[in-house]
């Protein structure tokens, strides 16, 4: 039994499932999760000292790679001034100034502690601002673990929400309408049925929790038009895509303007930070200037703000996003070429610094139902074959992979070579 296995056995007696977030338990792929000792650049080192090329990146935040010296130094300096004050700081102002300068649709922003807090707060704000209760989300999209968002879709294009987890009252879920991602007709049907009751649409502009599903041409723009037509707000959940597919987020990349935007992951530079923001008239409805309540003891934490500010300044440089996209393109093309050589049917979706690997003979993967038709068992085998060769992919067929600026062409080539070897064993 190695150290990770020993730690996992101990953890299971103290922490539910041995982990503090379910996907880390390797439930989707089987086996024992790695316990990580340290990380640097594009590499993780487990409790037994084995190194891995990392494509999880702490589930998205590590766009600069692990333990980046600029972020590390900023955090050390901030810690020296105090861990938390419970009062406003200049860094909060500087951070808000930077974020609103980078995201064109955000006139104002409020900091929170996680992506879940950001989406939960944005939806409350949308409901309060519009005076309506219902919201539209999309099958296969994840927006955190707030009660009204843990909803699954039933049959048909339009489904009144049913709880997706015990502990979520049906009365909470009934206001959540689930439509099909990349299917505007399902959204039109929802608005036709509830024309005066829908407060908002919330959408991942690139769906990253059914692996990686980009929007079809016109999909996001169609959502914008429907919101305008029916007086609803468009919330773009950029917790995953913000500062990853483009400096101005996926909304810049796909040229769509939301009313509210949710941010997380990269905005914290590896620290727990979320944010939501948007049109001034909507944001000013928040307390203390407006009646809609939202608060947080550690929101705008000075250490977290220092990390996020340092990270955003580092990526706000010429050439960063072309470099990130080139690395991702090279990986995707190499994986597809290796799969063709070994006659393994494969689709690789990728946008900016995100990618998704699908074992399928479908020509494309564009929605949740397409994802369900992929070969999850083959992915499990592939994951472990890659792990044995020192390549750490997301331990789930439903999670996107992430590139960092710390990955080298040598890392990419090693990954492609490992994939070729793995594909040969999957026949």
Swiss-Prot record:
User: Which pathway features in its UniProt record?
Assistant: Porphyrin-containing compound metabolism; protoporphyrin-IX biosynthesis; 5-aminolevulinate from L-glutamyl-tRNA(Glu): step 2/2
Q: What is this protein called in UniProt?
A: Glutamate-1-semialdehyde 2,1-aminomutase
What is the gene name?
Answer: hemL
Recorded GO molecular functions are: glutamate-1-semialdehyde 2,1-aminomutase activity; pyridoxal phosphate binding; transaminase activity
Q: Which cofactors are reported in the record for this sequence?
A: pyridoxal 5'-phosphate
Q: Sorted alphabetically, which Pfam families does this protein's record hold?
A: Aminotran_3 (PF00202)
Where is the protein localized? Answer: Cytoplasm
Q: Which residues carry this modification: N6-(pyridoxal phosphate)lysine?
A: 265
Query: GO terms for biological process?
Result: protoporphyrinogen IX biosynthetic process
Keywords of the record, alphabetical order, are: Cytoplasm, Isomerase, Porphyrin biosynthesis, Pyridoxal phosphate
Name the catalysed reactions. (S)-4-amino-5-oxopentanoate = 5-aminolevulinate
A Gene Ontology cellular component where this protein is annotated is: cytoplasm
- Cite the EC number: 5.4.3.8
Subunit details for this protein?
Homodimer.
């Amino acid at each position: 039994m190695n150290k990770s296995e020993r730690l996992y056995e101990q953890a299971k007696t103290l922490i539910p499932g041995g982990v503090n977030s379910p996907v880390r338990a390797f439930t989707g792929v089987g086996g024992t999760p790695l316990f990580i000792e340290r990380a640097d650049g594009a590499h993780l080192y487990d409790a037994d000292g084995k190194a891995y090329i990392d494509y999880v990146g702490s589930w998205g935040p590590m766009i600069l790679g692990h333990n980046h010296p600029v972020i590390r130094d900023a955090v050390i300096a901030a810690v020296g001034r105090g861990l938390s004050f419970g009062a406003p700081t200049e860094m909060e102002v500087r951070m808000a100034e930077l974020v609103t300068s980078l995201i064109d649709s955000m006139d104002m922003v409020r900091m929170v502690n996680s992506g879940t807090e950001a989406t939960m707060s944005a939806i409350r704000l949308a409901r309060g601002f519009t005076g309506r209760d219902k919201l539209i989300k999309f099958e296969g999209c994840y927006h955190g673990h707030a009660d009204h968002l843990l909803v699954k879709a039933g049959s048909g294009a339009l489904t009144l929400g049913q709880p997706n987890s015990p502990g979520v009252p049906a009365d909470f879920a009934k206001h959540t309408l689930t439509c099909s991602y990349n299917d505007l007709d399902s959204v039109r049907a929802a608005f036709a049925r509830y024309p005066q009751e829908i407060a908002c649409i919330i959408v991942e502009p690139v769906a990253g929790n059914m692996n990686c599903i980009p929007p079809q041409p016109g999909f996001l723009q169609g959502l914008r038009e429907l919101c305008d037509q029916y007086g609803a707000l468009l919330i773009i959940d950029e917790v995953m895509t913000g500062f990853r597919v483009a400096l101005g987020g996926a909304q810049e990349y796909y040229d769509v303007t939301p009313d509210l935007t949710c941010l997380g992951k990269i905005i914290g530079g590896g620290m727990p930070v979320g944010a939501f923001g948007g049109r001034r008239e909507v944001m000013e409805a928040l307390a203390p200037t407006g009646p809609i309540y939202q608060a947080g003891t550690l929101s705008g934490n000075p250490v977290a703000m220092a990390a996020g500010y340092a990270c955003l300044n580092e990526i706000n440089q010429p050439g960063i996003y072309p470099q990130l996209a080139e690395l991702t393109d090279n990986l995707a093309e190499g994986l597809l070429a290796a799969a063709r050589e070994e006659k393994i049917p494969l689709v690789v979706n990728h946008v900016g610094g995100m990618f998704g690997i699908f074992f399928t003979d479908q020509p494309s993967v564009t929605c949740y139902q397409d994802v369900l038709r992929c070969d999850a068992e083959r992915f499990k085998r592939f994951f472990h074959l890659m792990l044995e060769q020192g390549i750490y992919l997301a331990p789930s067929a439903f999670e996107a992979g992430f590139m960092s600026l710390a990955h080298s062409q040598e890392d990419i080539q090693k990954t492609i070579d490992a994939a070729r070897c793995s594909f040969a064993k999957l026949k």
